[in-house]
């Protein structure tokens, strides 16, 4: 059997189907809640996808927001991604010492769980003249492991 060497030969039908299903569910939820259609942000977690799949999602299917959950994975494929019109969000646990590696690559960080991490993000973002949106994790249930 001949090995596939280009994205032209590779089928991404599963991505078309999955995205259509997710968008339909989002539209139904918007309708049920009374929100205007298209006002909900679709953030595609791409942790197990390869760069061809991600580029297909963003450049062919129009997904504009992708979420990475590992610093090393983000760094290893960052240059191969077609980032035209795409915002990358960091959605995984982030150690303070790794902020410097992603601060110029992400639109937001969704996992800020300590003041020291927030301060490091602020310091690194200011150094390059950027503002980074952050989402703060709050342990409202006083659970010890959160």
Locate each region found by the language model:
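Conserved alpha/beta-domain cores
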Residues: 1-146
């Amino acid at each position: 059997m001949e090995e596939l060497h280009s994205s032209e030969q590779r089928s991404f039908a599963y991505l078309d189907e999955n995205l259509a299903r997710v968008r339909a569910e989002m539209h139904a939820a918007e309708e049920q809640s009374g929100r205007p259609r298209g006002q909900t942000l679709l953030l595609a977690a791409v942790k197990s996808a390869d760069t061809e799949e991600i580029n297909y999602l963003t450049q062919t299917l129009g997904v504009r927001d992708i979420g990475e959950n590992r610093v090393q994975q983000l760094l290893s494929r960052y240059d191969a991604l077609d980032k035209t019109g795409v915002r990358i969000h960091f959605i995984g646990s982030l150690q303070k010492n790794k902020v410097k590696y992603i601060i110029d690559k992400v639109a937001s960080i969704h996992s800020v769980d300590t003041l020291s991490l927030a301060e490091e993000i602020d310091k690194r973002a200011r150094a390059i003249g950027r503002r980074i949106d952050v989402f703060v994790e709050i342990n409202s249930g006083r659970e010890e492991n959160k």
